[in-house]
Design a protein with these regions (language model features):
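Acidic/glycine-enriched connector segments
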Residues: 18, 22-33, 44-164
């Protein structure tokens, strides 16, 4: 009588057949990688608040979190980048199309090195809102950008938490 092939046994072709067991629906929510957008004003300079906020994210959610910013080199997002990488979190930035692509850029290579256009700043908000699960905004936002930002939040059904 032939023995039936079970999990982990070597079959005729010499390859090991492995079947992944189901872990249940209760634990599936923990497997999803969370994308948290932390964006802010270029004049925001409270480094301690940003550092403590990112540290609390790491302590509460673990290191399987992706921090998303617009890639600004000044203000809040400069410190978000520094501390997200320092604490070992994944980091993605959606910098404007007129800049060069870097190691942490979220768009493809052909998106970058374009001539400057004023709507590129608004397109950053599109990318951030589209790719994030939670959005936190440090400091104030310009009125011209706020209208566009609020429309995007309504379109994608997301909410933002404004922090000072």
């Amino acid at each position: 009588m032939k023995k039936s092939q079970e999990h982990g046994m070597v079959g005729r072709s010499g390859l090991k057949r492995v079947v992944q067991k189901d872990i249940g629906t209760r634990y599936r929510t923990n497997l999803k990688k969370m994308n948290i957008a932390i964006i802010g004003s270029q004049r925001y300079d409270s480094v301690r608040n940003i550092r403590d906020f990112i540290f609390n994210i790491r302590e509460n959610l673990g290191v399987d979190v992706n921090i998303i910013t617009r890639g600004n080199k000044d203000g809040c997002e400069k410190w978000v980048r520094k501390y997200a990488l320092e604490f070992g979190l994944r980091y993605t930035e959606y910098n404007p199309a007129h800049t060069t692509r870097n190691l942490y850029s979220g768009m493809s290579d052909d998106y970058y090195d374009k001539p400057y256009h004023p709507t590129q700043i608004l397109h950053q908000y599109d990318c951030v809102v589209k790719h994030s699960d939670k959005i936190f905004y440090f400091g104030g936002i310009k009125e011209s950008e706020q209208k566009h930002f609020e429309r995007l939040l309504v379109r994608f059904g997301k909410k933002v938490v404004y922090l000072n």
